[in-house]
Amino acid sequence: MLLKLIVALSLTLTLASATSDPKGWFCSFECNDWNQLEMACQKEKDCFEKTNNQFTNETVACMQPCWDLGIPCRTQCYKVYDQCTSDCPYTVPNPYECFTTCFKEAFAEVKPQIPKANLDE
């Protein structure tokens, strides 16, 4: 039951963030492999079980190392997103095409690889 609640809450927050935080929403897709690493870490740590299914400061402290795993990818994604948004204003003939081309090329150069130690787990 708790898992269903967490999934429903995550979906709701993801949809809401698509409009309120387009950069975060966009980068969540671009860094999906890193997000999977975070989720595997959370599952392994089982922080909610340790806090009797309560979301407390202890839960946050338990989960923080997992959340931090995705920082390298999100940091690079946010930088590239901002740069391409700046380089492709709505005044260019096709801003969406400009942005997607800019992002694809620039992010391919800087997206960090998941450390091999994490891939073996």
Curated annotation (Swiss-Prot):
* Glycosylation sites recorded in the entry for this protein: N57
Position of the signal peptide: 1-18
Q: Which UniProt keywords apply?
A: Glycoprotein, Growth factor, Secreted, Signal
Q: Which GO terms describe its molecular function?
A: growth factor activity
Superkingdom assignment: Eukaryota
Name where it's found: Secreted
What job does the chain carry out?
Interacts with the p75 low-affinity neurotrophin receptor. Evokes neurite outgrowth and modulated calcium currents in pedal motor neurons. May be involved in target-derived trophic support for motor neurons.
Q: What is this protein called?
A: Cysteine-rich neurotrophic factor
